[in-house]
């Protein structure tokens, strides 16, 4: 071990070990600092070089280390060794002052950097706030548009409700389009429901008519096996036609089209029959309800008439009872006079 600059440096020479390590465990010195005069092992030499980059480290040699001691007097070496610690102290003070100045200079730079960072952060925050506001406004606009669309859809549904339209159509079908009366009669010639005025002053004058019950029973009793028979006949004719080798492809196509047209006509007739049955059944239900309502109304009229008659009889009986009561009051008075 060896002490650094000052009086201690003059008194003790280098012992060839690291001055930074513990005295008991100090390894051999490998480098020496020309400014400080301390000896270091390789590890502490690297640390010293990083801490003081302006210091010059040289390889430690025992004979060279003796030149640093005050006893080495050859060629003014002792004077240089005495002056070296003083110069080293001045160099350390200068470096410390420069470090303080550099720290002071770095503080404004750091402050300016922090100010710039704060300004950048404030700008970023303001931009984020603007984006959030725009997003919130866009969401509100979307919500308003969705609400308006929903309201428009509800209004459209209420205005164009298919069930309401179907019910209106059914009610309109139950009335005669020419006279506005209930459809209570069936025209056999036109296969159509009519009202009671159509055969009198309408287009069905002189046509064969029937009641709804008669028309319903007649249509229902008709044989509905025409479609089945037509399909069986179609299959048989197709088999027979396809087995004929003289029939060409074009002839076969034409034959199939003609046969299917016949089947389609049978299907249309069956469809029309089913629709007539539904219309007649609905008209019968309407007529039945109308009859029930008419019966209820006539019953109510009879009840009202009976109530009026009962009230009239009650009034008459009250009027006839008043003179009798007056006569009874006069009779006791006459007996007193007698």
Curated annotation (Swiss-Prot):
Region spans: Disordered: 1-25, 72-162, 307-338
Source taxon at top rank: Eukaryota
Matches recorded under InterPro entries: TRIM/RBCC, Znf_B-box
Compositional bias per record (Acidic residues), positions renumbered to this chain: 95-162, 327-338
Protein keywords: Coiled coil, Metal-binding, Zinc, Zinc-finger
SMART domains for the chain: BBOX
Coiled coil: 109-153, 257-322
Binding positions for Zn(2+) per the UniProt entry: 176, 179, 198, 204
Cross-referenced PROSITE patterns: ZF_BBOX
GO molecular function: ubiquitin protein ligase activity; zinc ion binding
Keyword Plastid tagged: no
Any Gene Ontology biological process: innate immune response
Cellular component terms per the entry's GO annotation: cytoplasm
Zinc finger residue extent: B box-type: 171-212
Assembly mode: Interacts (via coiled coil) with TRIM17 (via coiled coil).
Chain's role: May play a role in the process of differentiation and maturation of neuronal cells. May regulate the activity of TRIM17. Is a negative regulator of PAX6 expression.
Protein name: Tripartite motif-containing protein 44
Organism from which the protein derives: Bos taurus (Bovine)
Lineage: Eukaryota, Metazoa, Chordata, Craniata, Vertebrata
């Amino acid at each position: 071990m060896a002490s650094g600059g000052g009086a201690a440096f003059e008194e003790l020479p280098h012992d060839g070990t690291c001055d930074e390590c513990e005295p008991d465990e100090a390894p051999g010195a490998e480098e020496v600092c020309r400014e400080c005069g301390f000896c270091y092992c390789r590890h502490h030499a690297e640390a010293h070089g990083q801490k003081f980059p302006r210091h010059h480290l040289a390889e430690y040699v025992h004979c060279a280390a003796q030149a640093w001691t005050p006893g080495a007097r050859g060629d003014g070496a002792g004077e240089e060794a005495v002056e070296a610690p003083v110069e080293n102290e001045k160099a350390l003070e200068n470096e410390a002052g420069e470090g303080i100045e550099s720290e002071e200079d770095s503080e404004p730079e750091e402050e300016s950097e922090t100010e710039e960072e704060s300004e950048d952060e404030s700008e970023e925050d303001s931009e984020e706030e603007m984006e959030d506001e725009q997003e919130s406004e866009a969401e509100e606009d979307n919500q308003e548009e969705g609400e308006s669309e929903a309201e428009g859809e509800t209004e459209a549904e209420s205005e164009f409700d298919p069930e309401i339209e179907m019910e209106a159509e059914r009610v309109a079908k139950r009335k005669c389009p020419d006279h506005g009366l209930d459809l209570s009669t069936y025209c056999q010639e036109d296969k159509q429901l009519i009202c009671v005025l159509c055969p009198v002053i309408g287009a069905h004058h002189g046509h064969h008519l029937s009641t709804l019950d008669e028309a319903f029973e007649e249509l229902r009793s008709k044989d509905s096996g025409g479609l089945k028979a037509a399909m069986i006949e179609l299959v048989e004719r197709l088999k027979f036609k396809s087995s004929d080798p003289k029939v060409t492809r074009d002839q076969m196509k034409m034959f199939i089209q003609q046969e299917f047209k016949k089947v389609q006509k049978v299907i249309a007739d069956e469809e029309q029959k089913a629709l007539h049955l539904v219309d007649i059944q609905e008209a019968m239900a309407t007529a039945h309800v109308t009859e029930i309502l008419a019966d209820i109304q006539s019953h109510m009229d009879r009840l009202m008439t009976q109530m009026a008659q009962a009230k009239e009889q009650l009034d008459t009986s009250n009027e006839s009872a008043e003179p009798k009561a007056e006569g009874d009051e006069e009779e006791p008075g006459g007996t007193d006079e007698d």
